[in-house]
């Protein structure tokens, strides 16, 4: 398990004056990844300028340390692309979590170092556009996620149930990851074993075992 630390755009209004210092302290103790960070024009009363400032600062921090970044984006893909293109970006790349952007942006984002993760949530019938996009993601840029305990697979695909101990409401169990792999293989029309091997290779490139002392490389600037 690799911990990741960052200020999500939904919660930046709650940050304290010394948030940057606290984030650096966490990354000093666990230098594995930064995120989720990003931009979101979907939430109520969003302040895009503030989101941009917080995102750019965290992206620069990740680039300086060459840490992978997990990025959240809703309805701000053009701005996100421009900020990523301006850099700096981590040399090892960055993850676009539950990528829901245009299919046409996959190739230019991949050239900047993007990996694209597909969640089980995209198995919902109404997510046809997202499935078509992931069918086109370069195989060396594909990752899989559960997005547990939030948005999960459709009920008929869930293999492991979990309930909130306080509310008794169902929440999404991370053990459903294997079912997400099977869904992704369907979308890609690939053998499950082939897809799983490729995803493992991609994961190791983006999230190397920090404890093994993988040497950092310079950040991407253009």
Question: Regions from the language model: what does each represent?
Answer:
Residues 3, 34-36, 62, 97, ...:
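Conserved, mostly hydrophobic/aromatic
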Residues 14, 44, 48, 80, ...:
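Short, function-defining helix-loop hinge/capping sites that tune catalysis or transport
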Residues 58, 72-74, 146, 188:
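Short, cationic motifs built from Arg/Lys/His that form the positively charged side of catalytic pockets
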Residues 16, 23, 73-88, 95-98, ...:
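Distinct, well-ordered alpha-helical segments
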Residues 1-68, 111-115, 120-125:
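Active-site gating/metal-coordination segments in enzymes
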Residues 33, 69, 94, 142-144:
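Residue-level marker for buried hydrophobic side chains located in beta-strands
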Residues 41-42, 103-104, 108-222:
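H/E-rich (His + Asp/Glu) clusters that bind or coordinate divalent metals
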Residues 66-69, 92-94, 115, 192:
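Short active-site oxyanion
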